[in-house]
């Protein structure tokens, strides 16, 4: 994490927004008129938001984040644009409510930058890092009632195996789940180090030497479960498209295959004619709602990855709304 020399935010809280130039390039055509509204649904530390409001001088930005600390830091970073920025401390699945409360019927652009922010990764107290010995928390929103420790110590072996297999794509899910249940019968598992070492011991020795840290997939799975990451994304993508005005644009940055596949499936379905097979003519309400702006998922350049290794897993997809989904049949 390095500081932007042009920013007034302390270096410790400044991050490098991923693929920021491409994000701005894709959003800007929708933001060229006074009063255009762009939603940064995951404002985080404000890096993308700052670049967008700087480039789109007539636009207003609404930034959402479920982490109150992130909102405070983003407010610092965006202080110079305070007259054009509203920050709201809610998760992005409250998008419809946020717009309704402000009397906004449609927006020009929406950005989602999914996954962990630098703020979460770099704060050991959050319990996301398997390389540290800290409480097993993993909540992006500290107000959530359930921690990773709660999941590990209360889910059945079957439930744990499902979480690890589905959200972590962990091939040793059953072995790890059984090991967790045996260990917690003696003593609750409460720290990241305890869980990390347990996972390492549970999987076969040859597998420990390949594919990165042995606990990587387990930690990913627990994080997704605790924060309902995929559920929120699946619920919110249709809401986001409904909120876009025709000609509006949506950009999504994802960081693991489960997120990217969810976005890919949704975009492809919305960009396809949904007329049932066998009908003699296409249904007007089944016409494509989106036009894809990216050919597949775009990746960061080698230069960006070299400067910011955390960008390496990023996948970017974008689309433009071409039909008002609220039109009459």
Curated annotation (Swiss-Prot):
Which residue intervals are annotated with compositional bias (Basic and acidic residues) in the record? 317-329
GO BP annotation list: rRNA base methylation
Query: Quick one: which residues bind S-adenosyl-L-methionine?
Result: 46-48, 65, 92, 113, 120
Q: What is its main location?
A: cytoplasm
Q: Which GO terms describe its molecular function?
A: rRNA (cytosine-N4-)-methyltransferase activity
Question: EC no.?
Answer: 2.1.1.199
Q: Which Gene3D superfamilies match?
A: Putative methyltransferase TM0872, insert domain (1.10.150.170), Vaccinia Virus protein VP39 (3.40.50.150)
Q: Name one Pfam family in it.
A: Methyltransf_5
- GO CC, alphabetical: cytoplasm
User: What InterPro entries does its record include?
Assistant: RsmH, SAM-dep_MeTrfase_MraW_recog, SAM-dependent_MTases_sf
Would you identify the family this protein belongs to, as annotated? Belongs to the methyltransferase superfamily. RsmH family.
The task this protein performs is described as: Specifically methylates the N4 position of cytidine in position 1402 (C1402) of 16S rRNA.
The name this protein goes by in its record: Ribosomal RNA small subunit methyltransferase H
Q: Which organism is it from?
A: Acidothermus cellulolyticus (strain ATCC 43068 / DSM 8971 / 11B)
């Amino acid at each position: 994490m390095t500081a932007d020399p042009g920013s007034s935010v302390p270096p410790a809280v400044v991050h490098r927004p991923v693929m920021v130039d491409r994000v701005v390039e894709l959003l800007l055509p929708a933001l060229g008129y006074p009063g255009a509204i762009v939603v940064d649904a995951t404002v985080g530390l404000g890096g993308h938001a700052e670049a967008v409001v700087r480039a789109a001088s007539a636009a207003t930005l609404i930034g959402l984040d479920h982490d109150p600390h992130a909102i405070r830091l983003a407010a610092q970073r965006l202080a110079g644009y305070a007259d054009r920025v509203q920050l709201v401390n809610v998760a992005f699945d409250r998008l419809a409510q946020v717009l309704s409360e402000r009397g906004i019927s449609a927006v020009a652009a929406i950005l989602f930058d999914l996954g962990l922010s630098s703020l979460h990764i770099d704060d050991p107290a959050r319990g996301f890092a398997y390389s540290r010995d800290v409480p097993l928390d993993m909540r992006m929103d500290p107000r959530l009632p359930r921690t990773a420790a709660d999941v590990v110590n209360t889910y059945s072996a079957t439930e744990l195996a499902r979480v690890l297999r589905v959200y972590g794509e962990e091939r040793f899910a059953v072995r790890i789940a059984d090991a967790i249940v045996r260990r917690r019968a003696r003593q609750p598992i409460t720290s990241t180090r305890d869980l990390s070492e347990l996972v390492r011991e549970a999987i076969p020795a040859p597998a420990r030497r390949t594919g990165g840290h042995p606990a990587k997939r387990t930690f990913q799975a627990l994080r997704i479960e605790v924060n309902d990451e995929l559920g929120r994304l699946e619920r919110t993508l249709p809401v986001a498209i409904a909120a876009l005005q025709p000609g509006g644009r949506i950009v999504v940055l994802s960081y693991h295959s489960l997120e990217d596949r969810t976005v890919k499936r949704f975009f492809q379905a919305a960009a396809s004619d949904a007329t049932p097979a066998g009908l003699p003519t296409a249904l007007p309400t089944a016409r494509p709602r989106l036009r894809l702006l990216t050919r597949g998922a775009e990746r960061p350049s080698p230069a960006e990855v070299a400067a910011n290794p955390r960008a390496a897993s990023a996948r970017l997809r974008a689309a433009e709304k071409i039909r008002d989904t609220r039109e009459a049949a």
